[in-house]
């Protein structure tokens, strides 16, 4: 209870334990946009692997039929993260988007190839800098998530995905 916190710890309590209003935004789902759909709950652990595969393939089928829907960078980030976790996506959806190999900085790719996990994570932190992850452009978020996928640090990746993908209100 906030009333029981000593006066010299009230700021700490409100920022870290009590929760500040800016961090307590709830997720609003928009099932018309892939990366804002209920499927993002997979990264909370709220979705069975078989169920996410089935639902994602249904969703991609709708997208393929709808010529007006263009996959955004965040949609691609979402799909690539699921693929990294071993989620099977039907081959008929492979042509929905293209990935450029040049999107990963060479120095980070070299660290990943040499299994220098700590160095690669520090480099990612350096890229993020003092910015909030929500404020970073989609291309940079893509390469950060791609790095975390390759390093198999899913816990960190999932927390970042839940910050950047869903619509917060």
What are these regions (language model features)?
Residues 1-169:
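Non-catalytic terminal/accessory regions
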């Amino acid at each position: 209870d906030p009333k029981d916190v000593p006066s010299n710890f009230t700021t700490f309590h409100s920022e870290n334990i009590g929760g500040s209003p800016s961090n307590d935004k709830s997720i609003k789902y928009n099932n018309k946009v892939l990366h804002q759909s209920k499927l993002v709950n997979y990264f909370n652990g709220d979705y069975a692997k078989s169920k996410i595969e089935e639902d994602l393939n249904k969703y991609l089928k709708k997208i393929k039929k709808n010529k007006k829907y263009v996959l955004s960078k965040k949609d691609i980030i979402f799909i690539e993260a699921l693929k990294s976790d071993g989620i099977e996506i039907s081959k008929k959806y492979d042509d929905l988007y293209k990935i450029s190999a040049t999107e990963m900085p060479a120095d980070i790719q070299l660290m990943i190839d040499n299994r220098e996990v700590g160095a690669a994570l520090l480099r990612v932190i350096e890229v993020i800098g003092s910015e909030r992850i929500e404020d970073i452009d989609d291309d940079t978020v893509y390469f950060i998530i791609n790095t975390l996928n390759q390093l198999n640090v899913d816990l960190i990746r999932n927390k970042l995905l839940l910050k950047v993908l869903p619509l917060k209100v």
